[in-house]
């Protein structure tokens, strides 16, 4: 990451308080999440981000299993992630997320992870598409889900 990009992210994080984010999930780092040195393996941050998005939807009353039964699902279309600091075994992390933009058949989640000292250790931007699972083609979000997400946003 370029120094300019990192400075922009730090400035953005300073201007975005936790209250700007609609959901926060605390996650403990387990041994299974780390490499032999006790540092979180970078791809596991993707799992942490996914858990926060899934738990937020569950809290909003959106049951993803029920959605799958209708032949529709949410898939990650695009990810942009920056690892800024390491996370270590047994640390308690906070995963924050908000919807940056809602579209007819996709949404963009803005997420970041902080450590126990409140320092941002990882940031992510995720484009989630709503697709017809049989055709693997984009479809409009079901109306009830779209309404819940608009209210939450």
Positions of PLM-derived features:
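Hot-dog-fold acyl-thioester-processing enzymes
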Residues: 2-77, 132-153
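A short, structured loop/turn motif at beta-sheet edges
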Residues: 16-18, 115-119
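Generic short beta-strand
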Residues: 31, 111-112, 128
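Conserved GNAT-family N-acetyltransferase fold
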Residues: 49, 111, 124
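Hydrophobic beta-strand-centered segment that forms part of the acyl-chain substrate-binding groove
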Residues: 56-108, 121-123, 128
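A generic structural motif
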Residues: 84, 114-116, 131
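A structural signal for beta-strand boundary/capping segments at domain termini and interdomain linkers
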Residues: 120-121, 138
